[in-house]
């Protein structure tokens, strides 16, 4: 009986292992999120001072880097010095045509007031917004932060990542890759 039970367990284990090996791979990279291809140019929200900001802001640059973050999020806080450095670099290099926008993830103590205080205390100067339903439909799909979307001047989301950037070089390479790709695409049309 013990031998039969052992053989039966071995067969079940082998069948389970084969089903795992032959399973179809997931269609998406786990670091990528849905939303690529969506047009977000119709958002209408406010900045942390209550001033209205619309999707027209996307017209200000060929590439807009939008980062979804919260004050309590460790990975968000870790990547912010890198974002600030890139914001300063691209602000002083207007021909690069890149802008940075933050969108706060409200809740768990992160409010417009606490976000504004955090940004000011740390010298972070890029535009930060509250999420409206349009931005939330892209950024709040997984419940994870930080998230980053790359948006073209036309308002179309080109990329959507979850997780933070761990170095300035990693962030610069990511931005340059997308900037180059969007420049090539613009020149082809």
PLM feature spans:
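Thiol/disulfide oxidoreductase modules built on the thioredoxin-like
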Residues: 120-125, 130-179
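Structural microenvironment flanking redox-active thiols in thiol-disulfide oxidoreductases
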Residues: 77-122, 132-138
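Hydrophobic beta-strand anchors of alpha/beta hydrolase catalytic cores
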Residues: 65-66, 100, 148
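Short pre-active-site segment immediately N-terminal to redox-active cysteine/selenocysteine motifs
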Residues: 62-64, 69-72, 107, 144
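Sec-dependent N-terminal signal peptides of Gram-positive bacterial secreted proteins and lipoproteins
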Residues: 3-23
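A short beta-strand-turn-helix
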Residues: 42-64
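Non-globular targeting/processing and membrane-anchoring segments
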Residues: 16, 181-189
């Amino acid at each position: 009986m013990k031998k039969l039970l052992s053989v039966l367990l071995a067969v079940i284990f082998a069948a389970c292992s084969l089903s795992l090996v032959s399973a179809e791979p997931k269609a998406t990279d786990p670091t990528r999120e849905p939303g690529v291809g969506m047009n977000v140019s119709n958002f209408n929200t406010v900045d942390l001072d209550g001033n209205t900001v619309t999707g027209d802001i996307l017209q200000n640059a060929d590439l807009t880097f939008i980062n979804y973050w919260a004050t309590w999020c460790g990975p968000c806080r870790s990547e912010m010095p890198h974002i600030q450095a890139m914001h300063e670099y691209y602000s002083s290099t207007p021909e690069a045509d890149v802008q940075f926008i933050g969108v706060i993830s409200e809740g768990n103590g992160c409010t417009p007031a606490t976000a504004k205080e955090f940004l000011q205390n740390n010298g972070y100067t890029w535009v930060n917004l509250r999420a409206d339903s349009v931005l939330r439909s892209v950024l709040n799909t997984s419940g994870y932060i930080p998230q980053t979307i790359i948006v073209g001047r036309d308002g179309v989301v080109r990329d959507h990542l979850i997780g933070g950037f761990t170095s300035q070089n990693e962030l610069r390479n990511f931005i340059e890759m997308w900037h180059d790709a969007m420049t090539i695409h613009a020149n082809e049309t």
